[in-house]
Amino acid sequence: MNWIQALLLGLVQGLTEFLPVSSSGHLMIVRELLGVDGEGFLDFTVTVHLATVLSTLVVFWKPICRLLAGFFKFKYNDETDYVFKIVVSMIPVAFVGLLFKDKVEALFGDSLTTVGICLLVTAVLLVLSDTLPRLLAHGTDIASGESQVRPFTRSGREARNGISYWQAFVVGIGQALAVAPGLSRSGTTIATGLICGVKREVMAQFSFLMVLVPILGEQFLDLLKVVGGDAVLGGGVSPLCLAAGFIAAFISGLLACKAMIALVRKAKLSWFALYCLVVAVLIFIFA
C-alpha cells in the first residue's frame, strides 16, 4: 500500500462510516479495485476506525459532555435515562461480538458476493424506513412524509428522550446484524429506529452515539488477536500510510457525519437504497 492508496481508502472509510452504504463493504471493494494486499490491513483498519470515532466525538462533543455531566450527578435524570438506553442498545452487539465474532467472520470472509447481498438487504431496510412507518401510522402527514407514530412505554406514556428501552434494544439488534460486510451499521440502526417509530431527529443523534463504544470494542478485540498471536500489526503498512489514512478518514468523517445528521432529519433514505442497489448489481456483474 502506498500513501495515495491509503488516502483514498481513508476517504472511503470516513464517508461511508456515516452514510448508510456500509463502510466495511466499500473498503473491501475499493481495496480490490486498487489491488491493495490484505497483509497488514488490520492495523490500517484499526487506524481509520479510530479516526471516524474521533470525528463522531468532535461533532457530538456538546451532547456527550452534557450526557456525562448529567450522568455523574448520580440521579435518574434525562441524561442518565439516555445513557442507560445507549447501554441497552449495546447488549445485542456485545453478545454477538464477544461470542460469535470469529464465527461470523469465518462465515462471511472477504467475499464480494456477500457484500453485494448485504448491500441489497441494506437497500430494502432503507426503503422500508421511508415507507413502512407511514403505512402503519394513523393520521400520517403525507405531504411531509413524517410518521405520526410515537415511541411509547408500556404504561402508555410517551418515552423519555423520544426513544423507549425496547426501541433502543431493537435498534441494537439492527447494529448486531451489521457485523456482516456490506450491511451498513448506520443504515441498519437508523432504518430500524425509524421503522419502530422513533422520530428522525432523535435517531440522527442516537444512532451515532450508540455505536461509539461497540466500534472501540471491535478494534480492541482485533488488538487482542495480536496479543494472542492470531494476527500481526505493522505488517506491510508504513507509518506514512497510516497517517494519511487517519487524516483522510477524520476529515471526511467530519463532513459525512454532519451531512448525515441533516439528511436523516429531512431527506428520504431511499436515495441511498438506490445507490446500494446499483453497487450490488455491479458487484454481481463484475466480481
Model region roles, listed by residue range:
Residues M1-A287:
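Multi-pass membrane proteins that catalyze or facilitate reactions on polyprenyl-/lipid-phosphate substrates
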